[in-house]
Design a protein with these regions (language model features):
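Interdomain/boundary linker segments immediately adjacent to catalytic/signaling cores
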Residues: 1-22, 28
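Conserved catalytic cores of phosphodiester-cleaving nucleases, focusing on short active-site segments
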Residues: 30, 50-74, 93
Length: 140
């Protein structure tokens, strides 16, 4: 009877694993470009979350990472990664950024970027085809 109440390990959904992998690749790319990773997967209640927070000398960037198993520039049923960051998603990112900044004040300029990670759609194992960093992708 008590066996019914045992917790079972639930495997992450494939889309979530793909997203996690994309975030790792985006962080590695940004680090290689000279940014310092300040935070990953910052979550507040509701849908407010920040995938990555990175900084350089003058700017704090709030990064939304979108990962797709598609060729760069190709259309998919989900549209382009950038198109997936619609007005509702942007509002959630802006609110999360305000909360993060209230908890971690800085004099640096805030900027909102999108990093698109493209994975080879023909491979089962993830293989990065391209990483596109769209700087200052949207404003407050």
């Amino acid at each position: 009877m008590f066996g019914l109440f045992r917790r079972r390990a639930i495997a992450k959904a494939p889309a979530r694993r793909t997203g996690d992998y994309g975030e790792e690749q985006a962080a590695a790319y940004l680090k290689q470009q000279g940014f310092r990773i300040r935070a990953r997967n910052v979550q507040y209640e509701g849908r407010e979350e920040l995938d990555l927070v990175v900084e350089d000398r003058t700017t704090r960037r709030f990064i939304e990472v979108k990962t797709r198993r598609q060729l760069p520039g190709a259309e998919s049923r989900y549209g382009t990664p950038m198109a997936a960051v619609a007005s509702d998603k942007r509002r959630h990112i802006l609110n999360a950024a305000r909360r993060y900044t209230a908890a971690h004040p800085t004099r640096k300029t805030a900027q909102f970027d999108i990093v698109e990670v493209y994975l080879d759609p023909t491979c089962d194992a993830p293989r990065v085809l391209a990483v596109h960093h769209l700087q200052d992708a949207f404003r407050t």
